[in-house]
């Protein structure tokens, strides 16, 4: 798979923003080793704008960066989970026929965005929780509680912040499409 220079730069910027924004100092601790991160909105934005492959790589590399800088070691199971979240949310442009790029954001598209955010969090971090119980013998109740908190919290955060961002993107795209030469 060959990436254009633009795509590589987008992935690098997205991963850096998501990775640094995911550090504990920017999050809200809610449970054992569980933090709600506003950086999830960054992952959602890059996924929606650039698709599932970029979304996966921004989530995967960005979470890796978070774990490296946080100092608790890289948890590949949760790194993979963030990649899956980005990939699932990245399906948005294909499922909406790129209406956002045309300056449109009907409520059905926003509802789909929220459903993809929830599905991405449940599937992505559900995979992480499952792998933690298998590979690291983590207690099921602990990882299930982490999954429940993360999926609900991230979905709410992505929905609220994402709505504001998506409305702004749609407005900008609509204005740029309406420019005419005088």
Swiss-Prot record:
Record-stated family:
Belongs to the UPF0397 family.
How does the record say this protein sits in the membrane? Answer: Multi-pass membrane protein
Per the record, its GO cellular-component terms are:
plasma membrane
Residue ranges crossing the lipid bilayer per the database entry: 8-28, 41-61, 72-92, 110-130, 146-166
Name of the protein in question: UPF0397 protein VS_II0189
Q: Which domain of life is it from?
A: Bacteria
Which UniProt keywords are given for this protein, alphabetically ordered? Cell membrane, Membrane, Transmembrane, Transmembrane helix
Q: Does the keyword Cell membrane apply?
A: yes
Q: Which residues form the signal peptide?
A: none
